Amino acid sequence: MSMKNLSLISACLLLGACGSTPAPLDSGLAAPSQWRYLAAGRSDASDIRQWWKAFGAPELDSLLQRALLNSQDLGAAVARVRQAQASAVIAGAPLLPELNATLGASRQKLLRDSGYSGTDATSDNDAVDSFSAGLSASYEVDFWGGRQAAYRSALESLKASEYDRATVELTLLSGVANSYLQVLALREQQRIARLNLDNAEHVLRLVETRHAAGSATALEVAQQSSLVASQRKQLPLLEQQAHEALITLATLIGEPVQALQVAERPFDSLRWPETGAGLPSELLSRRPDIANAEAQLAAAQADVQVARAALFPKLTLSASLSSGANRAADTFRNPYYNLGANLLAPIFNHGRLRAERDRSLARQEELLETYRKAILTAFADTERSLNSIDGLDRQLHWQQQELEQAQRAFDLSDSRYQAGAETLLTVLETQRTLYAAQDAAVQLRLARLQASVGLYKALGGGWQSDRQGLARKD
């Protein structure tokens, strides 16, 4: 092979770098300067990479570790990452020449007559052996950057799959935390319901004693008996809900519910941390779903370049070095080479290539809107969590007073009734008020704990992107 031919091939290979990488698309969204519903004194965002430890429940840490090991959703996301890795290797392969080796042997033998012009065997030599060996290389010159763009698209898709795995993990962790809190809250409601049932039965015994003595009516006995029955009905309902929460937790962890044991723990021992939200502009690098949408958009942008490159001619270079003989020992004694170039230009394809380009452009526009929505959704999630925390904190202040006064009212009405200074109707009313206040206190505390989980999730759960967001931060 002459130096002239080598220079020609090298020049063609260098021309493959002609395709340029387009600039990233701008979402056109500006991050707000501050959060609207952030309570005073909570502006700084601390390190929340292990946010679940802040609740003070060591068992939750163990459950989350089991979920990371056993979750089918997370396992499927990891498998999708491996698929994307393989796709990136496949897409990058055409950027380099393809090299193949061949080694062959054949025998041609006439069965009768003298053969014809298409056969090597003749009546004089009715059996012909042939041996060959060779190396061949081919390369499509990437004049228009289509191959490079396809590789870039595959790399962005790989990043998107990795960010998707992080999103699945964040959703899994928050789901396990919420289910665990739900289990403990329902157990607390069961405990309170049993105490209330004991209390209601105590009052019923008192009413029955007074009725036997003639100081209470049958109506009062029936009224208190109805309240006792209502409290008894509440227990199996709460037990059913607790079992359902346990089943949900087991499913998230990836284990059968028979294998899951959640230890008894006082619900009021759980605490919620004081977590800031940082600046809105910082959120863009904390949310894996935003990074996923950004990577998908970048992949679609590269696909547009691929579709545009397909409209232009393709140049394929080929080279081979071969040798052959009629005897195996002489196979490598007759070397020769071939050089070739093939230019393929689309002329008429009934608009297919232009339609593919238009489809890629439409897909890019779709993903740009999806990316914008992901940014706005992230802002909305955080604002919603901050608003929820602020409102629940204020409710908890008054809920505590409501519970204290409801307990005091019941104690007073009960003692006055036993002294004959109050009617049973008042006792019944204060009982119902106390039960409702106790139940509301548990539900409000659960809502506050889950609001903290929601804020951690909205902030990305400590995840940090290694790339710059596309949204404007001015």
From Swiss-Prot:
It is a lipid-anchor. One of its GO terms (cellular component) is membrane. Its main location: membrane. One of its GO terms (molecular function) is transmembrane transporter activity. Coiled coil: none annotated. SUPFAM superfamilies: Outer membrane efflux proteins (OEP). Disruption phenotype: Mutant shows reduction of extracellular PVD levels and accumulates PVD in the periplasm. Mutant lacking PvdRT-OpmQ secretes PVD and can import ferri-PVD, but has an approximately 20-fold increase in the amount of PVD present in the periplasm. The pvdRT-opmQ deletion mutant also accumulates newly synthesized PVD in the periplasm. Mutant accumulates unwanted PVD-metal complexes. GO terms for biological process: pyoverdine biosynthetic process; transmembrane transport. Pfam families: OEP (PF02321). InterPro entries: OMF, OMP_efflux, RND_efflux_OM_lipoprot_NodT. A lipid is attached at residue 18 (S-diacylglycerol cysteine). Induction: Expression is iron-regulated and under the tight control of the PVD-specific PvdS sigma factor. A lipid is attached at residue 18 (N-palmitoyl cysteine). It is found in: Cell outer membrane. Residues 1-17 form the signal peptide. Keywords: Cell outer membrane, Lipoprotein, Membrane, Palmitate, Signal, Transmembrane, Transmembrane beta strand. Part of the tripartite efflux system PvdRT-OpmQ, which is composed of an inner membrane component with both ATPase and permease domains, PvdT, a periplasmic membrane fusion protein, PvdR, and an outer membrane component, OpmQ. Was originally thought to be involved only in PVD recycling. It was later shown to be involved in the secretion of both newly synthesized PVD and recycled PVD. Part of the tripartite efflux system PvdRT-OpmQ required for the secretion into the extracellular milieu of the siderophore pyoverdine (PVD), which is involved in iron acquisition. The system is responsible for export of newly synthesized PVD after the final steps of biosynthesis have taken place in the periplasm. It is also responsible for recycling of PVD after internalization of ferri-PVD into the periplasm by the outer-membrane receptor FpvA and release of iron from PVD, thus making PVD available for new cycles of iron uptake. Belongs to the outer membrane factor (OMF) (TC 1.B.17) family. This is Pyoverdine export outer membrane protein OpmQ. It comes from Pseudomonas aeruginosa (strain ATCC 15692 / DSM 22644 / CIP 104116 / JCM 14847 / LMG 12228 / 1C / PRS 101 / PAO1). The gene is opmQ.
